[in-house]
Amino acid sequence: MSHSWDYDAIVIGSGPGGEGAAMGLVKQGARVAVIERYHNVGGGCTHWGTIPSKALRHAVSRIIEFNQNPLYSDHSRLLRSSFADILNHADSVINQQTHMRQGFYERNHCEILQGNAHFVDEHTLALECHDGTVETVTAEKFVIACGSRPYHPADVDFHHPRIYDSDSILSLQHEPRHVIIYGAGVIGCEYASIFRGMEVKVDLINTRDRLLAFLDQEMSDSLSYHFWNSGVVIRHNEEYEKIEGVDDGVIMHLKSGKKLKADCLLYANGRTGNTDTLALENIGLQTDSRGQLKVNSMYQTALPHIYAVGDVIGYPSLASAAYDQGRIAAQALVKGEASAHLIEDIPTGIYTIPEISSVGKTEQQLTAMKVPYEVGRAQFKHLARAQIVGMSVGTLKILFHRETKEILGIHCFGERAAEIIHIGQAIMEQKGGGNTIEYFVNTTFNYPTMAEAYRVAALNGLNRLF
């Protein structure tokens, strides 16, 4: 690389994608700076998204577990916790994550520049520092990893004290008794679980005809049932006509003619790339209507020396994938090509209560493809470990080819689903005949474990063959 620039590469953003790119670059000997607009590294994932929402979910699920355990069935012992209490738990996790990630940059001698950056030309950034001063920095190459933020439609007043998005909900100052959640995607469903777990009434407004339609239908139906069973009111195929903030809450007028009122509204319908402040017009780069950039297989934009990773390029918009994208982009940036690539079957983890996780094809996809598959199931209620810990709700489903026994998809609903899925994923990734459902029959599992569900499901599926 040329050394006529201030840096070999500048990474804009310190979330998972930016961190992956920065660490990949410094490990290859590049002179790297990371620009972060906030005082702490970690990006939205650490401070407003993945980490705090999962910490909230964990605290609420433990309260539910305690209150439903027959050992503690005396009602005088029921646990109660305020939203402020569980937010404090989330804050402690955020602080630990921030300290750890700051250490990554320090140990690897990667410089952190704080401020808001925008492009002056194709190799120059203007950096507006927090004290109001403006500096310019240059680099041969760039990685845009500035993430995304909640989408704000113009006709919704997000300045109203009772109207929140998925970032500002973490600053909730009151204890709601009733919440409307608009948008039944992953974020909306996760927060529906959290609020209902705290005994808050929830109206979940879904603009589509079923929850999380990308999931295997049995998983989607299971979530719908558990929401119904816990008291969440789901309204499918609805869109808002008007959202009205009033003194004591929010009134939502739906296009179907219905009206809903609640203490507050969580608007969780879509996200927008954080590209509007980068002055991309100065370098001729264009985004789509949601502020996202198009990239090639090596994460290069229309300008070959500028790369983009993470939420700012859209699908799959997962923290796990963003980190890998950053590492791949770093390899391509230094070497001109990347030997690594994002895996074809990226696992999905949805942290509702209970969790949902999947990898590979759904039954609906395999049916449409006319693949001769069979299904093996294990119900958690039949597993000794689940009975011991009192988590009997859930199922593991394995889809496999009837003739070759190749595993085609795995779907899990229940506590620890996002962990359990990786056992099956590891087998699915095996080459040369290693991907076979018979592995689970011929392997000895620890007993009692949740992992034993794979053996039960494999036997169940193989017994269906004739």
UniProtKB/Swiss-Prot annotation:
Note on cofactor: Binds 1 FAD per subunit.
Keyword DNA damage: no
MF (Gene Ontology): dihydrolipoyl dehydrogenase (NADH) activity; flavin adenine dinucleotide binding; NAD(P)+ transhydrogenase (Si-specific) activity
Gene Ontology cellular-component terms listed: cytosol
GO process annotations (BP): 2-oxoglutarate metabolic process; NADP metabolic process
Keywords assigned: Cytoplasm, FAD, Flavoprotein, NAD, NADP, Oxidoreductase
Superkingdom in the source lineage: Bacteria
Residue stretches in coiled coil: none
Cellular compartment(s): Cytoplasm
Disulfide links within the chain: none
Annotated residues for binding of FAD: E36, R37, Y38, H39, N40, V41, G42, G43, G44, C45
Function per UniProt: Conversion of NADPH, generated by peripheral catabolic pathways, to NADH, which can enter the respiratory chain for energy generation.
HAMAP family for the chain: SthA (MF_00247)
NCBIfam families: PRK05249.1
Name of protein: Soluble pyridine nucleotide transhydrogenase
Gene name as annotated: sthA
